[in-house]
Amino acid sequence: MQSYVAQVEVDISKGLPCFDMVGLLDSEVREARERLRVSLHHINAALPAEKITVNYSPAGIVKSGTSFDLPTALVILAAQGKVPPERLKELWAVGEVGLDARIKQVRGVLAMLHAANQSAFRSYLIPFENLGEGLAVGKLPVMGVCSLEEAMEYVNASAQEQERMRRDAEDRWQSQAKGRMEKEKKTPDFALLCGMEEAKRAAMIAAAGAHNLLLAGPPGTGKTMLARCLPGILPPMSEEEKQEVSAIYSAAGQLEDGRLIQERPFVSPHHTASVYAMTGGGAVPKPGMVTLAHRGVLFLDEMAEFKRQTLDVLRQPMEEGKIFLARSRGNFVYPADFMLLGATNPCPCGYYPDRNRCRCQDWEVRRYLARLSGPLLDRMDLCCQIKQTPIRKLWEKREASYIDSEKNGSKWMREQVLEARKRQQMRCRGAAMRENGRLSPGEILKYCPLGLEEQEFLEQASEQAGLSMRGCHRVIRVARTIADLEGKDRIGVEHLGQALFFRNQNVLRE
């Protein structure tokens, strides 16, 4: 998520009274004319009956949003002599101004502050409600204000007084933040899943290497439950990733109370979601589901119920980790590096190939599964069929100690995932950390060498299974992750065999 720094200028001269705003402005920015007219009158700084021209540069970039209200008000106040104009040259400010002169919260402050930090302003002025985002960006001198009067007081104050005001604002925000009870996210434990050892193994491999996973099986077999358990074994985000994800949610207006996102996103759109909801839509696009799932999991429940066009737009971000959008206002690139987790039934009724229960005709099954295109399935690293668990399993080992038992619950699985990620990090030392599922073909040759026996095995298996070159690369990546989970430095035939087992995409038709 990239932002740019814009400059606001004003000229007040004699002439017919008017208020002109220029600089390729969206309607949201132009509407500030009436908001500021009322709010400035509210603080006894009414607009003069003269010709007022406000310019926003660079003029070649579309300006949108309400964040320009506060800087526009400040330059008008400076032109009226209410604040020293020289103080504004090194001041960066954003915020929406209400009719009562209150400063309201705006979206995208975190990303904007990262861009402004490159220009080294002396002071930063943002809405008080966004102060949590400001405090998250290093040690910037960020002041959160609640009203235009407070903003004027801050600009007119001395350096020592400004520092005191910043400390007071930070203390007020911290005290309010402590009063807010953070919603506790309870993630189900894998130990609650009985008789699903194969699926749990696939989930652990997927979490360890950031691989895409497809689950197939009849209704009620635990596919959705397994997906809900997956966040509990994912590794924690680094500080850089927290900033990156929080900037996305800030731009989307979904950052609660201005606090940084601490857990990896788990995004689960409804199967009726449109292409624009998935990728991001609007004249000036907002982040879509694929971007909100950045650095986390995009879970598509009832995957075959999605429209084929909606599923096919996932192919580019699955390969490149970002989504390219072309709109009338320009081209946009949003991050979209997610782990895709899909769950689907094998047919419309869900019970194919059990002909005692399945009511579907063969052509209905083919049409249903045709929504999952070949190129999309080819990008799924792991495929796992989940069968009906015998009912007696539900009454076995239900005591509380079973949840934390060794090699069964989320605690042990998470430890294994973290150890595998450490091995990947050590292997990539001196270079940017890359999960096995994100390795490029060149990096596969570097980090995933195969011996002669392993090469011959993979060649024979790929010919029998009809694997594409991309499919072979994905098998090697999964095998590398399996070897990491077992603490092995080199990929063996047994690791390739297990990767090929989970590569079997006939699980949708068996």
What positions do the PLM features span?
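Peripheral, non-AAA+ core regions of ATP-driven protein-machinery
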Residues: M1-L214, T224, G471-C472, R490-V493, ...
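Short beta-strand elements
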Residues: Y4-I12, M278, D381-Q388
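Basic, amphipathic alpha-helical bundle interface domains used for macromolecular binding and assembly
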Residues: L25-R33, A46-P48, N55-G65, P285, ...
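Catalytic P-loop NTPase motifs of RecA-like helicase/translocase cores
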Residues: D100, L300-K307, G350
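Short hydrophobic alpha-helical runs that function as membrane-insertion/retention elements
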Residues: R122-P127, P141-V145, L213-A216, P236, ...
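Conserved alpha-helical scaffold flanking the Walker A/P-loop in AAA+ ATPase domains
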Residues: M204, R259-L260, P265, Y276-L298
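Walker A/P-loop
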Residues: L215-Q254
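Walker B catalytic acidic pair
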Residues: R295, D301-E302, V313
